[in-house]
């Protein structure tokens, strides 16, 4: 399940994230469990393959600031794994205006 999210990573974050998930397997189990628990009942945003997408845009050495968002995305197709962001062409939700 998390393999799809990791396969999408092509930066130097990938080995670090794999190392962390291997060292702390409860993190991966919790993520997988939440997605499995609600599968077929409701949608969880972002889709599992996008949960690490924030790490696909730059390498570790280029990190300057971390911004963590907490406002939920309510509509399908809005959450893309980046705080305060939607994909191009997606109507901007009220919480981001």
For the regions a language model picked out, list residue spans one by one.
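GGW-centered surface loops in extracellular recognition modules
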Residues: 1-4
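A polyanion-binding, active-site-adjacent surface
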Residues: 7, 11-97
């Amino acid at each position: 399940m998390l393999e799809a999210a990791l396969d999408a990573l092509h930066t130097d974050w990938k080995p670090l994230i794999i190392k962390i998930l291997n060292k702390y397997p409860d993190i991966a189990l919790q993520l997988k469990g939440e997605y499995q628990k609600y599968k077929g009942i409701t949608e969880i945003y972002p889709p599992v393959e996008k949960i690490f997408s924030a790490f696909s845009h730059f390498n570790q050495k280029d990190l300057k600031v971390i911004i963590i968002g907490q406002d939920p995305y309510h509509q399908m197709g809005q959450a893309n794994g980046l705080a305060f962001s939607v994909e191009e062409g997606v109507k901007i939700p009220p919480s981001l205006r």
